[in-house]
Design a protein with these regions (language model features):
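Active-site loop-to-helix "anion-binding N-cap" substructures in soluble metabolic enzymes
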Residues: 1-262
Length: 262
């Protein structure tokens, strides 16, 4: 695997403005952060840059707003926590409030990089997307991988090149969109992939199963179908039932939240 530029490759950062693409897509409940792991995971990169004298501005998406400002997806709760964890570090508003983010609009890229001297990508979970904040800045600014992204790439590279057989990957999590980069990176290297967690329901829906009111990424069903139709061996849960009214177990096709059994 070709080495990717590291933070050290950016040279002297004293007084330089650095745009850091982070993955602060954290779960919220009533405007409160439920799990701050992703924010804390970005701190090694942020603090390294600050220690080197850089002026750091972070940028991230949060949820799936429809290309316009939506208070439900504001970065304000994240900004409040980040100000405590890394004082002086700025955070842009939700990138997806601008339709140019998901369409990779060159005009939005130009707006995004204006005034910055360097770019760091530390958003591994979003790096498979051809979005403006991911693929645009490296065309205009000296760029490097953050500590988190570099570590993920190193681990994946090691798994793919030094795997012992049989090599079976077990992947979970809530969203296919968060794991698609890992899945696609492993497809040609593993003997099988076992899908669990909430994202399994998107794969089940791709197979034509009813998933009731369970977590479902409708816009990822076609992607799940493509993966299932590939030459890779992918296993998804088959022992499912649904919780009906009053918590009773029923037929998944009748609705309710589907649960994996066993």
């Amino acid at each position: 695997m070709n080495p990717i530029p590291q933070l050290e490759d950016l040279g002297d950062l004293t007084g330089r403005r650095v745009l850091v693409r982070t993955d602060f897509n954290v779960p919220l409940d009533g405007g409160a952060i439920v799990d701050d792991l992703r924010i804390k995971a970005a701190l090694p990169t942020i603090k390294w840059l600050v220690d080197k004298g850089a002026l750091v501005t972070c940028a991230s998406h949060l949820g799936r707003p429809k290309g316009a400002p939506d208070p439900a997806f504001s970065m304000e709760p994240v900004r409040d926590l980040l100000s405590k964890l890394a004082p002086g570090v700025e955070l842009l508003e939700n990138l997806r409030f601008n339709p140019g983010e998901t369409s990779n609009d060159p005009a939005f890229v130009a707006e995004l990089v204006a005034g910055f001297d360097a770019y760091v990508n530390d958003a591994f979970g979003a790096s498979h997307r051809s979005h403006a904040s991911i693929v645009g800045p490296p065309k205009h600014l000296p760029s490097a991988a953050g500590r988190l992204l570099a570590r993920e790439v190193e681990i994946l590279g090691g798994l793919r090149s030094n795997a012992k057989r049989p090599f079976i990957a077990i992947l979970g999590g809530a969203k296919v969109s968060d794991k698609i980069g890992v899945i696609e990176a492993l497809l040609d290297s593993v003997d099988a992939i076992i899908i669990g967690g909430g994202m399994a329901y998107t794969f089940l829906a791709a197979q034509g199963h009813h998933v009731g009111s369970s977590l479902l990424e409708s816009d990822m069903i076609d992607t799940a179908k493509r993966l299932l139709d590939s030459d890779a061996t992918i296993h998804v849960p088959h022992d499912n039932s649904a919780l009906g009214p009053g918590g009773k177990i029923g037929d998944p096709s009748a609705g309710g939240e589907v649960r994996q059994v066993g």
